[in-house]
Each structure stands twice: as structure tokens, then as C-alpha cells.
Amino acid sequence: MTPRLLAVIGLPGVGKTTVAREFADRLDARLLRTDTVRTDCVSDPDYTPAERRRVYTELFSRARDAIGSGRSVVLDGTFRNRADRERAVELAGETGATLGVVVVDCEAPVVESRIAARENDASDADIEVYRDFRKRYDSVRLPHATIDNSGTMAATRAQAMALLGDD
């Protein structure tokens, strides 16, 4: 079976990790989060462009290794810049993995309340980071599906399963 490379992308706090975990469980895939990679690679994050490049380079390296061993991979990150998304396209092409891109979206008031309620999460993103990213997020031009995570977990799960063809 051909491995999949599924990039779950979107603004901070929209619920990417929730959706990515669901996909990883259903696909028996390795879940790779930029938040976790950053924690592994950087002791005191400053979120500079150089640091972002380092984190995404390591993310793609880990994905390449997993795909090389025959595993599917779910990537969880903002992928704020088109260049990072293009690297996912290139990786899929180089490894022969089937690429999917899922944009997770959520209404702003819901995001802000979820960010305020976060505890014990690898993400450092706060409400100001969310608002800043919202202003500077490159539009997604790649073919993609969208999941609206503004509602209940059951509604989000149903959308994810519909994308995978599961009911």
C-alpha cells in the first residue's frame, strides 16, 4: 500500500492537533507536530524565520524517514507560508507518497476561547500569535479539503471520516 502524507494545516488554535490525531489513528500513521519538533530542537524558542526553517526541515526529515520505512505520516503545523506547503508537495513527489492537504478552520471567538483554556500543550501560541498569524497567513492555493472545527467534536470527527471515506 502506498504511504500517505497528510498535511493538516491552519491557524494556531483552530484544532489542527485534534483533527491530525484523528487522521493518524484512522490511518495508523505517524503524527509529526511542528510544536513537538520545535520543543525537541530548540531550548528557548524565539520563532524567527531561521528557527521556523529549522523546525520544518526537521519535520520533513522525520516524515521522509517514516515514509521510507513504509509508514503514512500526518503533519500537524500552521504551514503559514506557501514555501512550507510546497516542501510537502516536493516530499510527496520524492517519496512516492500520496499527498493530501486538509485546512482546519474555526470561528475566531471559538479559537480565542480554546486558546485561553489550553493547559499542558506543546503549543506556545497565545491569542496575540493567533491574531498575528491571521493577518499574515498565506492563502492556500494547493488542492485541499477544509474541516470546520467550530462545532462539536462529533461534528469534526464526522467531517474527518467523510474525507477518509469512513462513516
Spans of features found by a protein language model:
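Walker A (P-loop) ATP-phosphate-binding motif of ABC ATPase nucleotide-binding domains
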Residues: 5
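Hydrophobic anchor at the beta1->P-loop junction of P-loop NTPases
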Residues: 8
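P-loop (Walker A) phosphate-binding loop of NTP-binding proteins
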Residues: 11
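Conserved substrate/cofactor phosphate-moiety recognition/catalytic segment
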Residues: 14-71
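Short glycine-enriched, charge-decorated loop/helix-capping segments at active-site entrances
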Residues: 45-50, 117-124
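Glycine-rich phosphate-binding loop used to anchor ATP phosphates in small-molecule kinases
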Residues: 51-100
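Conserved phosphate-donor/acceptor-positioning beta-strand/loop module used by diverse small-molecule
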Residues: 95-115, 147
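Small-molecule kinase domains that catalyze NTP-dependent phosphoryl transfer to phosphate-bearing small molecules
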Residues: 120-161, 166-167
